[in-house]
Amino acid sequence: MNIKSSQDLVNEANQSIETLNSIKVKSLVKNNECILIDIRDIRELWKEGTVKNSKHIPRGMLEFWLDPQSSYFKESLDLNKKIILYCALGMRSALATKSLVDMGYKNVAHVNGGFDTLKQSGLEVIKKERK
């Protein structure tokens, strides 16, 4: 049985999606030109925090929450803005970005290096409270 590795899938995704560095993302966030979406598991947010004003959409729900035909669709998101996804290191967000491109989204990208690089860029990180 020949199975592709997860790294192979990430590498393939990265060849067909837009990848942004944290400095560019910081500029887009500062100018309110994007929706920054944290796709990490909620436990990661509780432990490490999240970028202030980012939206949390768990990776497992992303396609459903961004599908206008789905009962899970989040109408509150301004989908006219650039959508930028991030995870911890940039692998899950690469796969998720590829999925949104496959759905037909054009103005979507992900963060190279993920949450760690966003923190290093100076974007404000806030604590995510447990409900």
Predicted regions located by residue number:
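Active-site flanking residues adjacent to catalytic metal/cofactor-binding acidic residues
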Residues: 37
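Short, surface-exposed ligand- or partner-binding patches at beta-edge/loop junctions that are enriched
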Residues: 86
